[in-house]
């Protein structure tokens, strides 16, 4: 559906002139823009209550970018599968979604996204998770990072009150 304008229903409701006016003002607020696609992986994500990107009440996000070279993609994928299995075995309360870099990204990476109420809640659940996984988890993370070419993390928040999703017809 890359050829479809997902904002078309909004433009139709607002009118082209009003819609353009919003973006004319918005365009003065930043100087760089890029588009890319990441693909959510059900196979690699750990969300025992069902895979969803809408984690109500948990709008804080921690994004872990695991950059990988082509020769290590499969090895890293296998370690992420092992990590998911360990989370399942231990009944971890910290859930994560895994995305894979796709169209428009520079470099290849797996992206692990963890939701929490706020930064303090993230630290608390991460500490509890580390304690739960113990030495087995520590070793698995060390093994996994042998295949990571570069690591970056970012944190931020979601704004559901500012979100727009076109209705499906």
Regions found by a protein language model. Give the residues of each.
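Short S/T/G/P-rich N-terminal loop/turn motif that feeds into the first structured element of a domain
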Residues: 1-138, 142-169
């Amino acid at each position: 559906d890359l050829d479809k304008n997902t904002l078309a229903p909004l433009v139709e409701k607002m009118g082209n002139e009003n819609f353009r006016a919003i973006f004319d003002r918005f365009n003065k607020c930043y100087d760089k823009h890029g588009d890319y696609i990441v693909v959510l992986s059900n196979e690699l994500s750990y969300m025992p209550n069902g895979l969803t990107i809408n984690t109500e009440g948990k709008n804080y996000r921690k994004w872990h970018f695991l950059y990988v070279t082509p020769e290590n993609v499969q090895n890293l994928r296998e370690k992420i599968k092992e990590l998911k299995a360990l989370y399942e075995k231990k009944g971890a309360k910290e859930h994560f979604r895994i995305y894979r870099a796709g169209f428009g990204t520079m470099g290849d990476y797996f992206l692990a996204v963890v939701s929490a109420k706020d930064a303090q809640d993230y630290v608390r659940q991460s500490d509890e998770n580390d304690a739960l996984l113990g030495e087995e988890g520590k070793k698995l993370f060390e093994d996994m990072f042998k295949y990571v070419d570069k690591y970056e993390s970012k944190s931020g928040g979601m704004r559901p009150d500012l979100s727009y999703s076109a209705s499906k017809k």
